[in-house]
């Protein structure tokens, strides 16, 4: 077993900046892992490394069929001419596509050890999408069995063995598969079969699969996602906790003459201006590009696609560094209606996402819409307010001021002049997403460190506000509340209060 270490340096949501230590150097995560064919390299591996990729994945099963024992003599790094990290798929994709392969798991495991791969995957049986639960259960059982045999089968050559999680849309099986692999001692896990989910636009199911697996994993174990190479799914995969993800999308799209952008793909025939400054897009105009010979056109387009994917990963990394990953994925979600369904999974799992989201950040957060009431930093503040207790009997509630914290605002100064018994009054401001903001804790992040859209929100769409409102009033014994009766948002919640509490307007 390798003594490798996964070191985490920065987190936001379930996403993290980290470092994988391997036999062939360090790899910064999150990392896109381009698929390289071991025999037919259309884009040279050196070019892929030049673009900025330090980890690639190739197929050990195809390597074995084409090179045989010669592969063990040469080693996989010499075969594909790549001196950085290499991950090998043992043939699971072929099992998914064709139903079976002509090699046994122990034989495949020994071959992966022999070719000195850095990351090795046992020969599993992918469940795919739409498989009946009984059959999926058999596949999970088989994969756990061969994974255990592989991990226990003697010494290795320092590889990091990756445990393949199966189960598909059967989340109880995903959980069982994950827990089984963790208990066996795998240092890294990989979630299988998401390609079919993405091809069917089942983004919500994909998100649920990832979250289900992550909840069964120790925080220190990295997670790989098979087949995720679309610029729209990458931010979500990272935000939900995937550290590496492989795909041949850069070449598959190129063969269809599809040009990757930051919000999807465009057919080359439909592009008037290249929205990119990579070496390919600055060399040709779209019309010149379309005139290239077919093979050259595909290869050049594949290189652009690699640059585009690399840029997307780098943007997500920057969002993690800035503490703005939530804002980034919310923006990405609006690129496709089906993709927006992943936001529901994030809001449903805000507590899980909050486990690795810093409670305090250097920069203000942006609150745009109802979805933002579920972002972890906001939820953390709600939890704080739900524990807040005041000895005062009178309560004044106003909209939050533009000056933050609230006790420095002209609005607060005006209240001091308006109420003679001000020292006996509990003052709260409010924000639709953040909820009630007691003036005493209005300087705590993010109450004093946010910007909110100045639009009229529907109070019925803010269950977190309602919960905090109810808990706040049950924890305190106010006999009188002063508020603006023209404030439609606030009026909705005031109606929920008991008749014993006097309601007065201070406007």
Model-derived segments and spans:
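Non-catalytic, usually N-terminal nucleic-acid engagement modules in DNA/RNA processing proteins
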Residues: 1-156, 365-392, 398-476, 483-507
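Residue-level preference for long, well-ordered alpha-helices that form the structural scaffold
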Residues: 101, 132-139, 143, 170, ...
């Amino acid at each position: 077993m390798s003594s490798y270490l996964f070191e985490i340096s920065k987190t936001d949501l379930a996403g993290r900046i980290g470092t994988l230590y391997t036999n062939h150097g360090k790899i910064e995560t999150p990392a896109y892992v381009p698929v390289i064919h071991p025999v037919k390299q259309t884009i040279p591996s050196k070019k892929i490394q030049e673009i900025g990729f330090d980890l690639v994945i190739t197929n050990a099963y195809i390597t074995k069929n084409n090179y045989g024992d010669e592969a063990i003599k040469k080693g996989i790094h010499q075969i594909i001419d790549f001196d950085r990290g290499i991950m090998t798929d043992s043939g699971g994709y072929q099992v998914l596509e064709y139903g079976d392969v002509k090699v046994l798991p122990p034989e495949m495991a020994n071959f992966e050890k022999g070719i000195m791969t850095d990351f090795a995957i046992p020969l599993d049986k992918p469940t795919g999408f739409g498989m009946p639960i009984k059959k999926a259960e058999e596949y999970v059982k088989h994969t756990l069995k061969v994974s255990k045999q592989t991990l226990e089968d003697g010494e290795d050559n320092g590889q990091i063995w990756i445990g393949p999680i199966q189960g598909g849309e059967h989340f109880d099986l995903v959980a069982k598969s994950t827990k089984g692999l963790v208990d066996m001692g795998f240092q890294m896990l990989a979630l299988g079969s998401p390609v079919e989910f993405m091809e069917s636009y089942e983004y919500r199911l994909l998100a649920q699969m990832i979250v289900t697996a992550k909840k069964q994993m120790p925080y220190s174990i990295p997670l790989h996602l098979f087949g995720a190479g679309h610029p729209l799914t990458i931010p979500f995969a990272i935000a939900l906790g995937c550290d590496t993800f492989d795909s041949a999308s850069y070449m598959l799209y190129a063969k269809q003459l599809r040009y990757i952008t930051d919000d999807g793909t465009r057919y080359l025939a439909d592009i008037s201006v290249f929205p990119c400054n990579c070496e390919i897009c600055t060399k040709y105009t779209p019309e010149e590009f379309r005139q290239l010979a077919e093979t050259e056109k595909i290869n050049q387009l594949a290189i652009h696609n690699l640059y585009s994917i690399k840029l997307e990963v780098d943007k997500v990394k920057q969002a993690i560094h800035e503490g703005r990953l939530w804002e980034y994925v919310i923006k990405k979600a609006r690129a496709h209606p089906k993709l927006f369904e992943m936001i529901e999974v994030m809001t449903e799992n805000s507590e899980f996402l909050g486990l690795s989201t810093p409670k305090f950040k250097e920069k203000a957060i942006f609150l745009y819409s109802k979805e933002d009431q579920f972002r972890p930093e906001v939820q953390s503040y709600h939890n704080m307010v739900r524990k807040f207790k005041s000895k005062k009997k009178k309560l004044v509630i106003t909209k939050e001021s533009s000056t933050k914290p609230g006790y420095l605002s002209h609005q607060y100064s005006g209240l001091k002049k308006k109420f003679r018994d001000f020292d006996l009054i509990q003052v709260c401001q409010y924000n639709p997403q953040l909820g009630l903001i007691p003036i005493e804790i209005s300087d705590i992040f993010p109450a004093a460190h946010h910007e909110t859209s100045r639009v009229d929100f529907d109070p019925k769409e803010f269950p977190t506000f309602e919960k905090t409102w109810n808990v706040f009033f049950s924890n305190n014994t106010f006999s009188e509340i002063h508020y603006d009766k023209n404030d439609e948002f606030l009026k909705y919640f005031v109606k929920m209060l008991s008749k014993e509490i006097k309601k007065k307007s201070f406007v």
